[in-house]
Amino acid sequence: MRSDTREEISAALDAYHASLSRVLDLKCDALTTPELLACLQRLEVERRRQGAAEHALINQLAGQACEEELGGTLRTALANRLHITPGEASRRIAEAEDLGERRALTGEPLPAQLTATAAAQREGKIGREHIKEIQAFFKELSAAVDLGIREAAEAQLAELATSRRPDHLHGLATQLMDWLHPDGNFSDQERARKRGITMGKQEFDGMSRISGLLTPELRATIEAVLAKLAAPGACNPDDQTPLVDDTPDADAVRRDTRSQAQRNHDAFLAALRGLLASGELGQHKGLPVTIVVSTTLKELEAATGKGVTGGGSRVPMSDLIRMASHANHYLALFDGAKPLALYHTKRLASPAQRIMLYAKDRGCSRPGCDAPAYHSEVHHVTPWTTTHRTDINDLTLACGPDNRLVEKGWKTRKNAHGDTEWLPPPHLDHGQPRINRYHHPAKILCEQDDDEPH
C-alpha cells in the first residue's frame, strides 16, 4: 500500500495553500455574469473535494490515537484544535466513517461504506447537504433490506445527487424509501433508537427552542398531564394565585387568553416546578436536585441584569426573584470577585463549597469545554494527597472526562487572579489558552488591561 513521506505531505499542503492564496488575490472585474457563475461553480467543486481529503486523516486518528494522546475524545480534540463546534466535529467523524477508506482487522484497505457517494464527493459533484440526505436515507432504511438492493439504492441516490439540489434529492429519497420499505419501522427497537428531546441554545432574548421525537408512552404520559394542567384557566401565570390542584371555574376560564401552546408551556413549568419542590429527586453531585443560580449583590438590589444557573442558562432578575417564592433553590451572591473562604479537612467538597463553585466557575474550567456546572465534578487543583485539605480557593469544576486528564499528564494550578489554569503535556501544547472563559462571556468582552490571561 502506498504511503507518502512527511516531506511529500507537507509539500502538497504548502502547494495547496499557495494556489488558494493566488486565487484569493484574483481581481475578477473583467468577467461577465456567466463567467462569474462558472468561477463559483469551479470553487464549489474544490470546496467539496476538500471534505473528501479530510476523511483519511480523521479515520487514521480514530484508529491510532488514544484519548491520552488527543487530550480527550476525538470529537473534543477536533472541536478544540479546529475551532469548530462539537456537533460539526461529530458530523465530520460520521462522514469520514461512511465515505473514507477503511481497514480490515488484517490491515488491508477496504472501500468506503457508501462507495458511490464517496466517489461523487471526491470528484466534487456532491456536497455536504447531498451527503446528509443520503446518510439520513440509510439511517431509516430497515436492516431487512438485502445488501444488493442497498448498494443499488446508494448508487442511484449518488448519481441523482450529482445533478440536483439537496432539497430536490430529499423528495426522490423519500419516494425510494416508500418503495423499498413501505411499512416503515414500527418495532419497539426502532422507536427506542429514534427517541429523544433536544433543547436548543438560548437565543438573545433568553428563549430556547425544543424539539424531538416522543415514544408512544411519553406522549400518553404528557397527554394525561396536559389534560389537567393545560386546561383553560389552569396554571395561568396572570392569576394572582394560579390554579394547579383545583378545577378552574368559569371565571378563571374566561380570564384565560393564552393559546394552547402557551398553556402547554405553563403546564410543563408547573409540573416540573412541583417535582423539584417535592424533594423526591434525591441528590445530584452532592446537592439536592434544585436550581442553583449565581448573581451579584448589586444586580439583586437593583433588580436588573441576569443570573446564571448551574446549567449555564441566563435567567432575568425578574424571573429569579419570582422563582425564589416557589422552591428552596440556591442563590449564591458575590459582593466582589472572590468566593467565601470555606475550609474543611474532608476530601469531598461540602455542599456550600459546591454552591460557590457553581457560582464562581459556572462549568468545567478546562479551556474549550462547555460542560455546565450541573455536569461537572469538584476537582482539587493541588492534589488532595499533597495538601489533605479541601479549600474553596484550591477547588475548581471539571467534567468527568477532563477530571481524568490530570491522571494522563495534564496539570492544574491557580494563578494570581484565582483562575484555574490547565497545562497540557508537551505533545498537546500548541499555544492554546490556559483558562476557560466560555462560561464567562462578559469577562471576554469587558476584560481590563491588567495582563490577565484569557
From Swiss-Prot:
InterPro entries: DUF222, HNH, HNH_nuc
Pfam families: DUF222, HNH
Record domain HNH: where: 364-405
Top-rank taxon, per record: Bacteria
Example of a GO MF term: zinc ion binding
Family per similarity comment: Belongs to the Rv1128c/1148c/1588c/1702c/1945/3466 family.
Protein's name in the database: Uncharacterized protein Mb1179c
Organism, scientific name: Mycobacterium bovis (strain ATCC BAA-935 / AF2122/97)
